[in-house]
């Protein structure tokens, strides 16, 4: 028996040594948290414990393009609004605009104003959702705070309960505008080819005007929170401008005739990494500029600029990879269309060294500026006397064939493209959503953040959260209706050996407690 003990001890020590050697080979973050949908990150380490590759993966498959086939085109605004419970208004509006093009009909001025009013309310409340519930907790509470605190409750703990009450009340009021005009907030039934389903009365316009005034004050307050919590903290500013969160890419966004951002309508503008205009095109021409690349490890297609071609996951002026979302929209714009947003726009670029800004985390700042613009635009539309004009529909008479619509979703440029037969039955549907436009840049951002944060195999939950911050800045939406309270979703990090065997597991439970297994 005594002769076996040294052998057993040697075996145990050898096994521990082997486990230590393999412990730093692969890190899996599954699920990633505080986003719309599901996703995971696989990080592969080299023998020195440094990051070799990192993959941002979307392991869910959605088939809306396929099962749109055979459906009446007029159903698409309702069908596509089911893609996501967080941004149904974006899909509803893109589909409605595609129907305008499909039936070759222009909505009356009042209908256009009602659509944009609803969309401005939606953009304001959605940007507030991201700042206070999803992305903001990383800064307001802190990137290395316990996971169970990085949520709206943690934010309230820092900024005060009265702020939480104000956020919830403001979002409720804005969503009431969507319900008033669109019938319901989650899956609105507002849009019709050539107009909208109902008018807005003078009495309703007066109510909307009150909410719009409150929204502007709320947006100014939110910008103040960002300044006091984020910009006043040198560590946060250093994190925003750090190389780990920087990529020089092309930028895309909708602009009006004066190259100012417009969420509802306009032309698509693209600037190169130096900020020079590369292209401006109509929605109908998007296939001349946008193409999709497929990788075997994700169900998301990776968009790139077609004339430049797919050059792999790299940035720079020769790469076709581009970004959309708030920062990209401000980069492509020459100015803002409203006064308060213009002041904030100038402040951001002056602080960050001029245009364009390529710091991924600056999306949070840009998003707050856009929140202010959306609120100001909401007020402009609420004050417009033409909003309550009863003429809200132009009946279509043309034979349908093909229609393309584009809007700026909160997360970036969104295209809907339908081809139908003469009866208006969908034969083909192509949806290019914001997260597809951003997918390649998100993948690069996650990998670069991982390489900048992980070295010598040193990993903590705080470090992994900073890696997650790289994708969270884009506010990606994976079109899934499953949601969990931010901070309560469990996190499992599994370290596997070269043969795929699990060597160690770090588990975060719903209460935020950590366990090594």
Regions found by a protein language model. Name each.
Residues 52, 426-428:
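Short hydrophobic-aromatic micro-motifs
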Residues 49, 423-424:
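Glycine-centered positions within short beta-strands or beta-hairpins
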Residues 2-411, 433-517:
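Active-site bordering "gate/hinge" segments
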Residues 421-423, 431-434:
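Short, loop-centered acidic/histidine patches that primarily coordinate divalent metals
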């Amino acid at each position: 028996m005594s002769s076996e003990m040294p052998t057993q001890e040697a075996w145990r020590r050898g096994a521990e040594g082997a486990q230590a050697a393999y412990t730093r080979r692969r890190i899996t973050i599954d699920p990633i948290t505080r986003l719309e949908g599901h996703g995971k990150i696989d990080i592969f380490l080299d023998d020195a414990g440094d990051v070799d590759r990192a993959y941002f993966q979307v392991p869910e498959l959605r088939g809306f393009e396929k099962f749109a086939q055979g459906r009446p085109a007029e159903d698409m605004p309702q069908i596509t609004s089911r893609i996501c419970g967080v941004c149904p208004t974006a899909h509803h509006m893109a589909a409605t605009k595609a129907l305008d093009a499909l039936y070759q009909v222009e909505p009356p001025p009042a209908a256009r104003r009602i659509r944009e009013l609803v969309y401005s309310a939606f953009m304001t409340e959605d940007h507030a959702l991201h700042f206070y519930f999803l992305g903001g907790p990383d800064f307001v509470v802190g990137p290395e705070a316990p996971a169970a605190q990085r949520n709206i409750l943690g934010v309230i703990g820092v900024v005060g309960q009265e702020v939480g009450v104000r956020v919830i009340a403001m979002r409720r009021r804005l969503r009431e505008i969507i319900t008033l005009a669109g019938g319901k907030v989650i899956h609105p039934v507002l849009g019709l080819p050539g107009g909208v389903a109902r008018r807005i009365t003078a009495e309703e316009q007066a109510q909307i005007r009150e909410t719009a005034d409150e929204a502007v004050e709320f947006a100014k307050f939110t910008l103040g929170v960002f300044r006091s919590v984020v910009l006043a903290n040198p560590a946060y500013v250093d994190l925003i401008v750090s190389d780990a969160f920087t990529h020089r890419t092309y930028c895309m966004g909708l602009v009006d005739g004066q190259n100012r951002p417009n969420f509802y309508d306009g032309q698509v503008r693209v600037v190169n990494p130096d900020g020079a205009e590369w292209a401006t095109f109509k929605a109908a021409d998007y296939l001349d500029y946008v193409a999709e690349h497929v990788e075997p490890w994700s169900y998301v297609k990776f968009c790139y600029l077609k004339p430049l071609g797919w050059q792999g996951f790299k940035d720079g002026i020769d790469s076709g990879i581009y970004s959309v979302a708030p920062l990209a929209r401000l980069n492509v714009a020459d100015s803002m269309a409203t006064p308060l947003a213009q002041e904030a726009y100038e402040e951001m670029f002056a602080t960050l060294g001029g245009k364009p800004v390529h710091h991924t985390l600056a999306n949070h700042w840009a998003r707050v500026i856009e929140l202010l613009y959306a609120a100001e635009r909401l007020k402009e539309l609420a004050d417009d006397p033409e909003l309550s004009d009863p003429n809200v529909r132009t009946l279509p008479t043309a034979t349908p064939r093909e229609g393309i619509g584009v809007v700026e979703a909160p997360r970036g440029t969104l295209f809907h493209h339908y081809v139908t037969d003469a009866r208006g039955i969908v034969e083909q549907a192509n949806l290019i959503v914001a997260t597809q436009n951003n997918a390649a840049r998100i993948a690069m951002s996650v990998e670069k953040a991982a390489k900048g944060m992980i070295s010598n195999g040193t990993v903590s939950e705080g470090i992994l959260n900073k890696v997650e911050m790289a994708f969270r800045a884009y506010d990606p939406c994976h079109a899934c209706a499953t949601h969990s309270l931010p901070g309560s979703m469990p996190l499992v990090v599994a370290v596997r050996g070269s043969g795929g065997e699990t060597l160690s597991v770090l588990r975060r439970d719903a209460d935020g407690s950590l366990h090594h297994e």
